[in-house]
Amino acid sequence: MRSCLSIVLAAGEGTRMKSSLPKVLHKIAGLPLVCHVIKQIELAGASQLAVVVGAGAQDVTHVVQSFIKSVMIFEQKERLGTAHAVLSARLALQKEVDDVLIVFGDTPLIKQDSLLKVREQLAVGADVVVAGFYASDPTGYGRLLEKNGKLIAIVEEKDASDEEKKISFCNGGILALNGKRALSLLEKVNNYNSKQEYYLTDIVSIASREGLEVQVVEVPFDNIVGINNCFELFEADSLWQKRKARDLMLSGVTILKPETVYFSYDTEIEQGVVIEPNVYFGLGVKVQSGAVIHAFSYLEGAVVGIDAQIGPYAHLRPGTELARSVKIGNFCEVKKAKIGEASKINHLSYIGDAEIGAQTNIGAGTITCNYDGFHKYKIVIGDHAFIGSNSALVSPLMIGNGSYIASGSVITEDVPINSMAFGRARQVTKKDYAAKLRVRLSGNQQKK
């Protein structure tokens, strides 16, 4: 297997984002742009990874090192162009590798297939390989100049002639170099251009003049699209969501209106699941086969068991684990709770820091009072228990198997197995008193 050093350029300021957050840390599907790129690079077989940081260097470094442990970080102190940025990783380039793969950290839709296609050309003898795409409107992109079927140069639009601007074959931003020639080619790049910057793209013309083998590989535009502003971020996120929905549907997931469903990068959904419109999947969600996620539900950090029913209008928060055939109904919020098989929380409830057994029913309006302003406390409810409507369960608390809690109760003490607990004031009924009350109240109103 060929060894590969991949260098990710993540030093740009991203001024057009109009944000204090470094551009590469903006997120698509809950994952920073640069991490999307790193993920695909790993899948494409890179054995070494270097990331060049600049604007927001400390924040970018922290995110990257949290995402992947084995990474070299280099800082570009001055913004002198893309070739200068790559040379900031000189120490990595001095190591002996077969391939050097250079990509931009703001291209989150990049796919391993495109990266592998570029690397394949190095494997068969190319010294320089560029990814290119055909654009219906090439405005803003560098143009690929060919002669006799050979790529001879890349010219940036600001430096292109009127004739060159008519070319629709554009630079896709992925560059691969023969590892033995990479450093020497980079050191030959000069800054003789309108911006006096060291362009990475000049490597193509340098290699061509030296008679080296230069190749171009066509890749789909949606694989290499870059992010420069918040609208482009939205467009890229929308495309990512379409890809995810398509992959899920082809794997056997039914999504009734996919354009209204939002997935995170790590969402796992098994075949046979049905997802109704307007559902949000935050980070860390796994949905097992046969489950139904009804409309307007919000899930994050939750595991949904086989054949479970969620919603509509349900909120599953981090730490939620639902066993087989659990039902979480309308306007219910569940947080950091394990719910046993076939248990039901059907209406208007908050269940937090709890463990509930199998085939237990939680009545409408029940809440767990798990926080005293300083600490969170846990409640444990056994199997086959029945919690009546409008009950307040004050943690810490244990309710035994088969126990029954009367509606409207405030329960503050443990309830043994197969017991019944009342925790409410006794009802007082005054017969025929309503008519007297109306007379008294109407008299008070007339005096005013």
Swiss-Prot record:
InterPro entries: Bifunctional_GlmU, GlmU-like, GlmU_C_LbH, Hexapep, Hexapep_transf_CS, MobA-like_NTP_Trfase, Nucleotide-diphossugar_trans, Trimer_LpxA-like_sf. Binds 1 Mg(2+) ion per subunit. This is Bifunctional protein GlmU. The active site is at 347 (proton acceptor). Mg(2+) binds at residues 106, 228. Residues 252-448 are annotated as: N-acetyltransferase. The gene is glmU. Homotrimer.
